[in-house]
């Protein structure tokens, strides 16, 4: 693609790790102070975070231009984006289905079968796509339907095929559970709040009527649905503000903008420093932007 385009993609690949890392710490922090119950939705949520992190780690590796050149159009890239798309999207969707469908249908899905579905999908998914990292590193190209013998691809592709069947069986059983929960009257009633959730929608009947609340609910606490079931909590972490001084904000300053521009100049200078001109004759020197950016920061 050329030096400029390759450097731009490398820089953007590196920058995307910042908001993604914030999201992951947000999810982990949400669970950190709680008492985790390993029901089926939570298992899929944990699986989602794990698979998404693996996909993120293998993605941020490609901000290194030599690594990106090695993995380009290989099965390593296939493994990376499937960990993000299937591990991130499919596991998240199944988590949401197992969590919210009881509120929609009024029936609880079989918990043991749900955990079995998670086990099949988790094992099948990793058996399918994790070997593709190694296949890509030893040279198997993507978008190629066949290959010659003797490259060392056979065993790992057989493992991936077995994993794909296991993953497919898990998905089919899960979809069967979702569909049958609308029609199978033998399933256990869900009740209002089968998960001990704390938000107001779980104070409604399951399934929810054509309207939500017949009267506007009176909210006296942050977790009103929880307190409706268990009473007010005497010991909790919420503290009243000590005074009404408001939020302290820093004074107006140009230094954040100067720092941002300096960081940009430093990053671009380090990317292009000592690079060779496309003609092969000139070595570019970006010492000045690097020094200027360092001083600005």
Regions found by a protein language model. Give the residues of each.
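Juxtamembrane interface elements at the cytosolic ends of transmembrane helices
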Residues: 1, 16-32, 93-100, 174-190
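Gly/Pro-rich turn-and-neighbor structural signature
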Residues: 1, 6, 19, 25-58, ...
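Membrane-interface interhelical loops and short amphipathic "cap" helices
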Residues: 1-10, 34, 60-81, 134-157, ...
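Interfacial and helix-entry/exit segments of alpha-helical transmembrane bundles
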Residues: 29-59, 75-78, 83-92, 96-130, ...
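Membrane-interfacial catalytic/cofactor-binding modules of polytopic membrane enzymes
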Residues: 40-45, 49-80, 85, 210-241
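Hydrophobic alpha-helical transmembrane segments
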Residues: 80-90, 155-171
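Extramembrane terminal tails and long inter-domain/linker segments of multi-pass membrane proteins
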Residues: 141-153, 179-260, 264, 276-283, ...
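Hydrophobic core segments of alpha-helical transmembrane domains in multi-pass membrane proteins
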Residues: 289-297
